[in-house]
Amino acid sequence: MVMSRTLVLVALLGFAYVCESALITNLPGAPISNFKQYSGYYNVGTKKNHMLHYWFVESQSNPSTDPVLLWLTGGPGCSGLSALLTEWGPWNVNTDGATLRTNPYSWNKNASILTLEAPAGVGYSYATDNNIATGDDQTASENWEALVAFFNEFPQYKGNDFYVTGESYGGIYVPTLVQTILDRQSQSHINIKGLAIGNGCVSANEGVDSLVNFLYHHGVVDQAKWEHMKTSCCHNDTDACPWHSFSEFSACGEFVEATQQTAWNGGLNPYNMYADCISTSASFRFGMEYERRFNKKYTPEVLGTVPCLDESPVTNYLNRQDVRKALGIPSSLPAWSICSNAISYGYKRQYGDMTSRVLNAVNNNNLKMMLYNGDVDLACNALMGQRFTDKLGLTLSKKKTHFTVKGQIGGYVTQYKGSQVTFATVRGAGHMVPTDKPAVAEHIIQSFLFNKAF
């Protein structure tokens, strides 16, 4: 018995050491905070060659009972640290790139949030053997490994409600990870309750079909050209038109290609069509380039850069030597960048539609789900989200209606299966909803997590 107790004590002391060694005690340029935060690495992969960097902020309210969220930024190849410091995190980076200010609409006011830079090669995550080749299945598996490591490092959170959340290509990351969690519950049980996806690219074909219509209804497509395509390509039904199916070398295909070019290479800000395009940003200098998402025609994908957005403040902040030291980043690693071209180019996109995984989560495992879209985003437009959700075939329980935040219409919400599945649009927001409309973003995540009425 004495030996057993000694071993337990050693284990407990070892656990305390792991947590405290990852504790961020002084974050440069940040206001004084009332919550704990941690930064570290999880070693994952079949060869244990991938080191995934995480940044974990505890809830400002009651971390022992508040839900735990995982956040995954998309790309593929972009870092969640940008979201933490410019979207929903406890601080927003100032334009000086040296200091942070308190975010009054932070999601960690009553939720603890784990941000994972994934896959390896993104941000401060790296491969010990420099092999960062990966794809959807491997990323989901390694993210699951990181989650298991997280709950081993912080076992006090194993009983808390857990949600997987993300943005953009998170429309693939999130459902594939949720499926992996459900498939591996016998190996390591995770108390998952739901998933939330912001402006998620959840269907490649629907993304193409909806964007063509979205651009027309926003006054971007020439009327005479539209009428011609309507009759010659779509049998006078543009809503049901399979724009994605046309050959690239046909007249219909060339029209579809032209609309994609307009969205991504025509001078518009693809992340907020009514916002200015900031041509001074480092990423803009790469041009409004694109490649094929999911290896299919017509479907654009921003390279490992972020066109039209000025990411220099967050980049400058995360590359400060004292910030790197506070986060425990190895000095041998190169400078942080918001996105990785290497990941974006080499990533194996294995799935083009998330319908089956979402239905498995909702119907077979009773998980909650929310899809929310800024309504002026071109990258993953709101019409795609609406069509995807509606085509799940779930029982409609609340027809589309507006909701208000601070006395103003924040957007529109539709619910299915009671309130188990929610689709919400955010008025005037682009791709990064918490950046454009922080109060509305806080409202919808609170409604989702705590079953509050919209």
Swiss-Prot record:
Q: Where is the signal peptide?
A: 1-21
Write down the Pfam families for this protein, in alphabetical order. Peptidase_S10
State which Enzyme Commission number(s) the record gives: 3.4.16.-
Disulfide connectivity for this sequence is none
Q: List the InterPro entries.
A: AB_hydrolase_fold, Peptidase_S10, Ser_caboxypep_his_AS, Ser_caboxypep_ser_AS
Active site, per annotation = S168, D377, H431
Q: Which Gene3D superfamilies match?
A: alpha/beta hydrolase (3.40.50.1820)
Source organism, top-level taxon: Eukaryota
Q: Which GO terms describe its biological process?
A: proteolysis
Could you list this entry's UniProt keywords, alphabetically sorted: Carboxypeptidase, Glycoprotein, Hydrolase, Protease, Signal
Question: What are the glycosylated positions?
Answer: N110, N236
Which parts of the chain span the membrane according to its record? none
Query: What GO MF terms are annotated?
Result: serine-type carboxypeptidase activity
**Family per record:** Belongs to the peptidase S10 family.
This protein is called what?
Serine carboxypeptidase ctsa-1.2
Organism phylogeny: Eukaryota, Metazoa, Ecdysozoa, Nematoda, Chromadorea
